[in-house]
Every structure is written in C-alpha cells, then in structure tokens.
C-alpha cells in the first residue's frame, strides 16, 4: 500500500483571558446592585444550555406565532379560530422533560403567553373581546359573533378543546428531573382591547389620549405576572414584547419588585429595559461578548444567553424544512461557551403536544455531545478572545485547566461509518476543502493525525488529552529560547480516529493558573 501522510493543521493563539465572569452577574439598576444579584445567578452561569419551547394555538395551522395577524398576512378571526383546534391530545410533559434532560440542558423556558394574548395556564384575568377591524366604516367592527367568550379568560383552559392548564404539569415534570423552570411572558398583548397596538400599521388608540385605558391594561398584565409568580414560582422569567413601550410605561420597577417579593431567587432576562439580569441576543451569533445595558446607558454584568431556533421559525411550521444540523448547533453552542454565554435552543411542538422527530433527534444528538464533554461545558468560564484561536475555548473556575474546542473540522472517526479507505479519504478531502487546507497527505500505516498548535502559553502542560478518549497526547514545545521570557510554541498531534463526529475538545491540565504571553515577540 502506498504510504501517504495526512496532516490537518490548526492554529491556536492564546491571547488574553476574560476575567470576572461571575462578579457582575446581574444588572445594576435602581435599588438592585450587581453584588446582591450575583449569588442567585450562579445556577444560570453554570447551566450553559437551555431549551426554549414556543407552543400555542398557532401550532394548529402552523402559522407564524402572533405576527401573522399583526402583519396582516392572515386575518385576526382566522388566527384566533385556531383556539377551536388546540387539543393537546398527546401532550405528555414528562416525555418533554425527559427529552430535555437527555439533551444536556439544565433549564427550559416555555411560552406561557405570546403576543396573541392566549394564556396556556388557568389565568383568572379576563380579556375583553376586541373588535378585530379598526375601520369605522367596516360593518364587522362590532364583531358578531365574538371570537371568544369574554365572560371567561382567554386561555387554552377556558376557550380550547384542551380544557387544561399545560404549564403546571410541565413545571412539575422539569423539577422532578432536577431542571430549572423558566416562564416566557409577552408584555404586549395584541388581543386585549385595552392594549394600544393590534396591527403593525394601525392601533386601537394612543396611550397619551387615554391613560386610564392603559392603566386598566397594566392592571391586567401585572395580575397575570402575579399569577405566574405565585402559582409556579419560576426560576426564570423570560420577558418579551417590551419594544412598544418604555420601562416607565410598563412600570418595570413594579414588575421586578413583585416578582422578587414572591420569589427572591427568581431571575429575569434583559428585556425589562434596565431591570433584568442578563443580556439576550436573538438568532444572530455575536462576535464580541454581549453585555447588559443599565439605566445609566453603561454596560453592567457579563452574563448572556443566545436564543436561537432549531429551524427558521419559533413555533411549529409544517413547511419549514430548514433544520439546523446537530453539528451546526453544537458548533454554535461551542462559540457561546467560548464567550461565557448560554444557548437557549428553541423547539416548536405540534398542537397535539408531540415534538417532531427532527427536533427529537437534534436534542438527542446534542445530548450525546454534552454528556461526553460535560466537564468542558458546565461551570466553565469564558476562554480566549476571538482572533487568535480558530475555535472557542473555556477554562475551569480555578484557571488550571484549559479546554480547546476544535470547531474547524467535522469529526472523522469512530462516530462516523465508512465502508473502506477510499470512502474515508473522500470524506477527509471534503472536510479539508471546507477549512481551506491544501496540505493533504495520507498515511495508511502510521495513521491520520490532526496537528494543533498553541502559542503564547507560559504554563507547563502537565497533561493533555482528548475528552472522552483514553490515552494521553504528547505536547511538544518548539522555539523556546532559554534566556527569553517569550514562551515557545506548543504542538500536539491528535489521532484522527480520536476526533469527535461533531466538535472535538482537548483538555490541557496546566501547572498553576493560566498565564499567557501577549507581547509582540522578539528578544525579551
């Protein structure tokens, strides 16, 4: 057999370390200091992975949640007519909780009420039956018949065939699995007749013209938040829909005050306009580490969470086939970890309460990877900044263990099946093409290796290994001048058959806390 050698080279530059991960765990707002918030944020900082669930009447026809009628892509009566089809016949919260646990997530957030104003719990707050046409000339303005029974709350309990609270059993199922429960709640409510907005081009009234009407809505909204607080004691409140009004108009201080009165350990996302605990970028992967902006307009706190769909929509859409692959999700998750953040990955169950097999498979694949690499994930701190390492990194809390995430190559090894060497070589060449490496050689007798290079590391490496694989790597230091303070360059040859099928993680145990050289080189 012809001897060919194959080497994949990764450049890993160690340049800097983000410190103080937990010191600013919450936003400094009026009456709340970062120091007083930080301890209760510990579980969130350590959790790293959560599952987001968008579920509501929009799953009946697979329409865009709330936005479809708000943007007039469908009529309001058609949208609200989905109430009659929401049955949740196959809903089993214990099955959901088991799958979430298997994914490696430490918490889950579910939509208790989206912008459409339909509650998924047994709320006792009444929603006036609103005219869906705002035109004075429209004969249907008075709306006959009504879209729901205004003598009963606008909820799936009172107005749909489901006839049950779907939030309470889910919260219980999560806690039975040792998971934290998060409640998504939309501040705005386009179905409430006392809320100013309805359509994107036309509202019911202007707040300044009818402040008493707005106060009636606030009483309704604060009443619902109070119900969620006292009935379910959420570990996390995930607010949304804040953009249509200011924090003064929402009375955000009261929201926070009331929640903490019911549960002092509850945390809130950053969509309370100055009264939340962590930043919440959406969909798009940040390049630099997000920070929470306080009431003073300055950055406060370092905790953040990326919320992201598993396909292109939050709720179930039958025509959305653009599922993210497990490899893509894991690589995105790795990037979040490298910047000290969390990933809140969304799924959208069907109206009957079942989760699609595509999303089930995604969560199971995620679970395989998280269980294998748990020590590099949970409780880790942000690693090196971007620009000098082609892949994220994390460190242990005592800074003596460095984890390198090799995201630039999709695994080729024990997790993938190839019939023969020709197929294996073809797969390798395909992967190398993706990373732009033109140095391609194969060695059928000596095996395949991936060469990882680390520079700027002052510490002695006590041991190096591939997480989840037996055996040790042999770091080699080159270019170290005995009389210079500039450290040498570290090379490690990683067997290709030790690579994970998604993202491989290397564990470097260091002598002492991580110490990095950040100079320009030369004779120092």
Language-model segments: residues:
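Bacterial N-terminal signal peptides
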Residues: 9-20
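Bacterial N-terminal signal peptides that target proteins for export
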Residues: 1-11
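Mature catalytic domains of secreted/periplasmic carbohydrate-active enzymes
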Residues: 27-524
């Amino acid at each position: 057999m012809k001897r060919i050698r194959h080497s994949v080279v990764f450049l890993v530059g160690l340049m800097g370390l983000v410190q103080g991960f937990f010191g600013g765990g919450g936003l400094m707002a009026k009456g709340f200091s970062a120091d007083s918030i930080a301890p209760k944020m510990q579980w969130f900082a350590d959790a790293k992975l959560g599952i987001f669930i968008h579920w509501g009447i929009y799953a009946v026809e697979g329409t865009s949640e709330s936005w479809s009628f708000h943007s007039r892509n469908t009529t309001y009566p058609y949208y609200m007519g989905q109430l009659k089809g929401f049955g949740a016949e196959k809903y089993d919260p214990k099955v959901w909780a088991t799958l979430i646990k298997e994914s490696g997530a430490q918490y889950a957030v579910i939509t208790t009420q989206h912008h459409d104003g339909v509650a998924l719990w047994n709320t006792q707050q009444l929603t006036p039956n609103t005219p869906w046409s705002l035109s004075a000339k429209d004969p249907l303005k008075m709306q006959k018949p009504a879209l729901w029974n205004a003598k009963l709350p606008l909820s799936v309990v009172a107005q749909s065939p489901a006839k049950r609270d779907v939030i309470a059993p889910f919260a219980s199922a999560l806690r039975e699995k040792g998971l934290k429960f998060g409640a998504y709640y939309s501040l705005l409510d386009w179905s409430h007749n006392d809320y100013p907005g309805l359509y994107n081009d036309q509202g019911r009234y202007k707040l300044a013209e009818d402040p008493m009407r707005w106060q009636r809505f606030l009483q309704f909204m604060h009443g619902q938040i109070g119900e969620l607080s006292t009935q379910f004691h959420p570990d996390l409140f995930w607010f949304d829909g804040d953009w249509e009004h200011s924090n003064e108009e929402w009375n955000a201080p009261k929201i926070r005050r009331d929640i903490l009165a019911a549960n002092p350990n509850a945390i809130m996302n950053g969509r309370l306009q100055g009264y939340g605990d962590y930043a919440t970028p959406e969909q798009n992967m940040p390049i630099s580490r997000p920070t929470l902006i306080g009431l003073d307009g300055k950055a406060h706190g370092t905790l953040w969470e990326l919320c992201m769909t598993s396909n292109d929509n939050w709720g179930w859409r039958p025509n959305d086939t653009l599922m993210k692959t497990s490899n893509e999700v894991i690589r995105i998750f790795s990037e979040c970890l490298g910047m000290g953040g969390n990933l809140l990955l969304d799924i959208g169950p069907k109206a009957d309460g079942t989760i699609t097999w595509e999303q089930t498979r995604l969560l199971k694949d995620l679970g395989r990877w998280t269980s294998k690499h748990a020590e590099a994930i949970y409780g880790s701190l942000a690693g090196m900044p971007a620009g000098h390492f082609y892949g994220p990194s994390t460190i242990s809390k005592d800074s003596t263990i460095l984890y390198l995430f090799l995201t630039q190559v999709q695994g080729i090894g024990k997790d993938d099946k190839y019939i023969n060497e020709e197929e294996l070589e073809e797969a390798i060449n395909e992967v190398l093409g993706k990373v732009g490496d033109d140095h391609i050689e194969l060695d059928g007798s000596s095996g395949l290796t991936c060469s990882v290079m680390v520079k700027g590391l002052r510490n002695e490496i006590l041991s190096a290994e591939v997480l989840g694989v037996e055996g040790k790597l042999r770091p080699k230091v080159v270019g170290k001048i005995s009389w210079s303070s500039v450290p040498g360059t570290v090379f490690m040859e990683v067997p290709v058959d030790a690579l994970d099928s998604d993202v491989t993680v290397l564990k470097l145990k260091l002598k002492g806390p991580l110490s990095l050289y950040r100079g320009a080189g030369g004779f120092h």
